[in-house]
Curated annotation (Swiss-Prot):
Role played: Acts as a catabolic phospho-lyase on both gamma- and beta-phosphorylated substrates. Degrades O-phospho-threonine (PThr) to alpha-ketobutyrate, ammonia and phosphate.
Entry keyword set: Lyase, Pyridoxal phosphate
Recorded family membership: Belongs to the threonine synthase family.
Cofactor(s) the record lists: pyridoxal 5'-phosphate
Natural source organism: Xenopus laevis
Top-level taxon of origin: Eukaryota
Gene3D superfamilies according to UniProt: 3.40.50.1100, Threonine synthase, N-terminal domain
Name of the protein this chain belongs to: Threonine synthase-like 2
Length: 472
């Protein structure tokens, strides 16, 4: 299996090369040159597999044994999930009104980012130890990615991590999960900007290929292919749990969508032959919805919502989806993305718009809808939803109320315990685990950056300081 940039400037890259990259040198994102197909017999075999077994099978399709021998791959995947609190990793909770909720938040930080990030940490460690190398990881977060990335690499001598979080735009718990990790290899910056704005200095820095190479810089944001790869597995698992497999019945999988990394994994699962229909459910930051419905891929102002981790107006993983669906027209992606970067808007070609509208539907959910859904789910089931999970469940309730009884799986990306203010706003009482309560008592450490600061310059200085320390 080899990888290519979505903009065509680089082909034939192996898995290790992609793992240790951020954006490709031409500004694109890495994707597999070929998507492996899974036939009906394989699906039936996999139907009895655990989530971890599915991760192993799917990763082995995209990682050649020359890169990582199968036994080594299985061992590192087993290690990745040791700290998860539920033996099923992503259990499906079945509730009234035909509601199936995939709980993706049983990892260390109580968010679905732990699923892929724990594997990425082990994959990085595997290659770095073999080559006695060090990397510096750059991550921008809208809320959950930062803490998950930190947990995946903390105390690892061969990795340092720099995290940019949007000051005042995360929940208090999300911020504490990052700022209370006081380790020599963890560097947290609280920045006066939106999560989209935090991506800009990182993208500019990755464009400086000499600097990136000199300091061994990479990203574990969902620009990193390995994040997308691991996430493919939970679409297969959700399908197996919610469909009567003997009929290969299509299942609708409802995906709360911000940066579009998760739904990119869903599109790849679909391309592999999994009979699913995807629903991209967004908050008022609706660029993905406008793209699906109207072919209008245009930037809007980032709006603060109750589903704060989805407050993203520039979902860079849409480039992967467009490339995947473009078929023989892949060469046009480079020009489309160049136009988007320059004008902050692009109209999709008619054929490409038809393909994306065929692959998924979309829905916009307001804060009022979120609160109403949290309340309804509690009233019917005594089950608390986080605001992002409520975005998915809102769509399910809309379909149920219109008598659509199709098998459906709602992805629940985070625990309600991380969003106490929203639960209280819904006139309910949050249920808070002890480890989250304990965050309030811990010391914190972070560096504040204002609008007046040169963010890219600060990043460069921090990276140079890390490299200098490693030489000493």
């Amino acid at each position: 299996m080899k990888y290519t940039s979505t903009r065509g400037g680089l082909i034939g890259v192996d898995f290790e090369g992609v793992l240790f990259s951020g954006f490709a040198p031409d500004g694109g994102l890495f994707m597999p040159e070929d998507i492996p197909k899974v036939d009906k017999r394989t699906l039936q075999t996999w139907s009895s597999y655990s989530y971890i077994q599915l991760v192993k099978e799917i990763c082995s399709l995209f990682i050649s044994p020359e890169s990582i021998p199968r036994a080594d791959l299985e061992g590192l995947i087993d290690r990745a999930f040791i700290r998860f609190r539920h033996r099923d990793i992503v259990p499906i909770t079945r509730l009234k009104s035909g509601l199936n909720v995939m709980e993706m938040w049983h990892g260390v930080t109580h968010a679905f980012k732990d699923l892929a990030m724990s594997c990425v940490g082990e994959l990085l460690d595997y290659f770095l130890k073999r080559k006695n190398k060090h990397v510096t990881i750059l991550v921008a977060t809208s809320g959950d990615t930062g803490s998950s990335a930190i947990e995946s690499v903390r105390r690892r001598e061969n990795m340092d991590i720099i995290v940019l979080l949007p000051h005042g735009r995360c929940t208090k718990i999300q911020e504490l999960q990052m700022t209370t990790v006081i380790e020599d290899n963890v560097h947290v910056f609280s920045v006066d900007g939106t999560s989209d704005e935090l991506d800009y200095p990182i993208k500019r820095l990755f464009a400086d290929s000499d600097f990136v190479k000199k300091h061994n810089i990479m990203s574990t944001n969902s620009v990193n292919w390995a994040r997308i790869l691991v996430q493919i597995a939970h679409f297969f698992y959700g399908y197996m749990q919610c469909a009567p497999l003997t009929e290969l019945t299509p299942v609708e999988i409802i995906v709360p969508t911000g940066g579009a990394g998760n739904i990119t994994a869903g599109c790849i699962a679909q391309a592999m032959g999994l009979p699913i229909h995807l629903v991209a459910v967004v908050n008022r930051n609706d660029i993905v919805h406008r793209t699906v419905q109207y072919g209008d891929f245009s930037l809007g102002d980032t709006k603060a919502t109750l589903a704060s981790a989805m407050d993203i107006q520039e979902p860079y993983n849409m480039e992967r989806i467009l490339w995947l669906l473009a078929g023989s027209e892949k060469s046009h992606i480079k020009e489309m993305m160049k136009e988007f970067q320059e004008k902050k808007r692009v109209k999709l070609p008619e054929q490409l718009h038809k393909k994306i509208a065929g692959a998924m539907t979309s829905c916009v959910v307001t804060d009022e809808n979120i609160l109403g859904t949290i309340g309804r789910c509690w009233e019917e089931n005594h089950y608390l939803l986080c605001p992002h999970s409520a975005v998915a469940v809102y769509y399910h309730y809309q379909q149920m109320d219109s008598n659509d009884k199709s098998p459906r799986c709602c992805l629940a990306p985070a625990s309600a315990a991380k969003f106490q203010d929203v639960i209280i706003k819904a006139n309910l009482t949050p249920d808070i685990p002890q480890e989250i309560k304990d965050l309030e008592k811990k010391k914190t450490r972070s560096h504040h950056l204002t609008k007046e600061d040169d963010w890219e310059k600060v990043l460069r200085q921090t990276i140079e300081s890390i490299s200098q320390r490693k030489v000493q």
